[in-house]
Amino acid sequence: IGCTGTLDGTQTHRLVLEGLFGPVLQVTTTKDLMDDKQIADLKIKCLVLKHSEEICKASRKWDYDTEIEYIVMNAARNKFITNLALSLEGNTLVLYQFVEKHGKPLYEMISPRCGERKSFLIYGKTDVEDREEVRALTEQEQNAIIVASYGTFSTGINIRNLHNIIFASPSKSRVRNLQSIGRGLRLGDNKKEATLFDIADDMRTGKYTNFTLQHFVERVKIYEEEKL
């Protein structure tokens, strides 16, 4: 028997699994688990940032990597994420993709303004023991901010006391997005709901739609398919 909460949505992946284990049987859905109060209720807030006309025109000539580079190193965007994280009540997880270009700069913007709130930076080189310590501390906190890479905190971390998730970096992976959402669905003693903030970047001009906005549209389709 093979069990998973997240197929990647491709026909090839499904056929490979069926070849190994037999027909795929979906025994429940995220929405059904929410309705049965087995997991926390989830609210999704999509925040679309409109970029300047000059940037929109320039982005037409960019490849995907150039667009990502611009997004994660955009000072105004990072300030927006910082202000958002600091404005939220409850424990907040800020997920990013690139450590040096995005994760560390975000943490350096957030941490000095936390006051008495605890803040943590987690990435691939963070010791497993330190990650577990952060997880344990967060369970006892009510207003901490964790700035963590997708690779370290999108899967395998069980934090029941997590109230907010911010997608600070764009991601086109169905599995990564759903598994990241799963971090916020655990029920806690004082937690019955969680909120996901999905940040997108609108650089459309004429008939052109930028790469990461296309990926955002795909994420919205996933949310609709999962009835989130």
Name each model feature, range by range:
Residues 124-225:
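Conserved RecA-like P-loop NTPase helicase motor core
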Residues 1, 91, 141-145:
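Loop/turn-to-beta-strand initiation segments
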Residues 13, 21-24, 40-43, 115-118, ...:
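Short glycine-/polar-rich loops that comprise or flank the Walker A/P-loop
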Residues 3, 93-97, 122, 168, ...:
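Short hydrophobic segments within beta-strands
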Residues 3-7, 97-99, 148-151:
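A short beta-strand-to-loop transition that corresponds to the Sensor-1 phosphate-sensing loop
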Residues 57-97, 101-112:
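Conserved interdomain hinge at the start of the Helicase C-terminal
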Residues 1-45, 223:
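Post-DEXD/H (motif II) to motif III coupling segment of the RecA-like Helicase ATP-binding lobe
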Residues 93, 107, 111-132:
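Conserved RecA-like helicase motor-core motifs
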